[in-house]
Amino acid sequence: MRLSLHFLGILLLSLACLSAGAESQRKLTSYQKYISKYSDLAIQHQKKYRIPASITLAQGLLESGAGQSDLARRSNNHFGIKCHSDWRGGRVYHDDDLRGECFRKYKRVEDSYDDHSRFLAERSRYERLFKLNIKDYKGWAKGLQKCGYATDRKYANKLIKVIEDYELYQYDTAKKERK
């Protein structure tokens, strides 16, 4: 009896490890697909707006759950950008820091990328970030947090971890989009 309980314990522990591994593998696969799909767009925006492609990709991955979050699916909003008073486009309401907050809604994901780049480039609170070296993703991540892009106090560390885990910094030095 003791041997079968011991065996059962090992079996349950093994199943738990396999389940955690499968979840980790699903996340890895969804992140890789997202990166493959949007890296060229992030590189284009880096060239046009001088926002590191690694930062754009990491923010898109985190804010949208690799495009799979409820908000991303309902609104094509991959950056968690809220409506603000000057927003005249589509809207969707989503629980975030508060219930029923207004978020920007886009026709296409590409429109979300365009708006994200303009959002950073045209707001004075982010101005100092554009003085950083394009390869300084750590400076950008910390700067976004200091400027109040997100309310999460660990936002910069999360961006940096995603950039380093998925080697997104390689896109900051890309000469052109992949074919």
Label every model-predicted segment.
Residues 1-7:
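Positively charged n-region of N-terminal signal peptides that target proteins for export
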Residues 2, 18-179:
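Catalytic cores of secreted/periplasmic lytic hydrolases that degrade extracellular macromolecules
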Residues 7-16:
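Bacterial N-terminal signal peptides
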